[in-house]
A protein has these predicted regions:
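Short, His- and charge-rich active-site/binding loops that engage polyanionic ligands
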Residues: 73-75, 80-98
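N-terminal module-boundary/linker segments of secreted carbohydrate-active enzymes
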Residues: 20-81, 255-264
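Mature, extracytoplasmic segments of signal peptide-bearing proteins
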Residues: 4, 18-20
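Bacterial N-terminal signal peptides
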Residues: 7-16
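Domain-level detector of nuclease and nuclease-like folds
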Residues: 90-264
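A generic structural signal for short, solvent-exposed coil/turn residues
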Residues: 14, 67-68, 93, 238
Length: 264
């Protein structure tokens, strides 16, 4: 009897070990649309350790470091190399430029509190020049607007203003936002964040939505994952514990949202 118990214990442990190391995406091959989105959400949440807002400074100094200039971070939109010590609020007088923590999915839509996990999620919070962060504000993503050279982006005017990052940033920004849209499905694991959705319209401050889904889907398809994006992803995963499935498997985006946008 003891031998049988030992054998059963060994088999259970072996199966657990295999499942723990298996490709988490292998079981998704037959899923599409909403079912696939739900399954990808579970993968995106796996291992997530919420960061403090203070921790984000050091995480971004690592994740957004400039590989060609030691001691600098690279802005998510501007692609400007900024001295890492020139942080907003603590930068010495010698700093000509300052950077802060840009929420690519604006925190005013809809996770303004620091105890909400999306507020400190480094998979979509990135280094950026203070001015470019301010100019982006809470704008939806779309094509068009006045070119802002220092931010390498375009910004519209008026109530329906939008933000268009440069081609160098479009794919990465799209995959960051897709991650947020699947990761946060209405607090299933106590992350204190509402269900966040990408939509095909302009959005208002305070609502848990961001536009424009179909523009982002096109950007994600047109601008593939770069080595810089892979390196950033790996750094965030080391600190935070979870992964962005759209960096690992960019094809998932079309399988989740392609029919909504008629993108092949």
């Amino acid at each position: 009897l003891m031998a049988i118990r030992v054998l059963v214990t060994f088999v259970v442990f072996a199966l657990w070990a295999v499942s723990a190391t298996a490709d988490p995406y292998a079981a998704l091959s037959r899923l599409e649309g909403a079912e696939l989105k739900s399954a990808v959400s579970a993968i995106a949440a796996r291992g997530h350790r919420p960061l403090s807002y203070r921790e984000l400074w050091e995480v971004l100094k690592d994740a957004d470091q400039d590989p060609s200039r030691s001691g600098h971070v690279v802005g998510i939109y501007s692609r400007t190399a900024i001295p890492a010590h020139c942080t907003e609020g603590k930068a010495p007088a010698s700093c000509d430029q300052k950077w802060n923590r840009e929420h690519v999915w604006p925190k005013s839509k809809a996770f303004p509190r620091r105890d909400q996990w999306a507020h400190t999620d480094a998979h979509h919070v990135a280094a950026e020049l203070v001015r470019c962060n301010s100019l982006r504000g809470n704008l939806d993503l779309a094509v068009g607007g006045e070119h802002i050279p220092e931010c390498a982006s375009r910004r519209g005017k008026g109530a329906s203003a939008t933000w268009e990052p440069s081609d160098a940033a479009k794919g990465q920004v799209a995959r960051m936002l897709m991650y947020v849209a699947v990761r946060y499905e209405g607090d299933p694991i106590g992350d204190r964040t509402p269900n966040l959705e990408l939509v095909q319209r302009s959005t208002r401050d305070g609502e848990p939505n961001l536009g424009n889904l179909c523009v982002l889907l096109r950007w994600g398809q047109a601008f593939p994952v770069t080595q810089q994006e892979r390196d950033r992803h790996a750094a965030v995963a080391r600190h935070q514990g979870n992964r962005n499935p759209f960096v690992d498997r960019p094809d998932l985006a079309q399988r989740i949202w392609g029919k909504e946008c008629r993108v092949p």
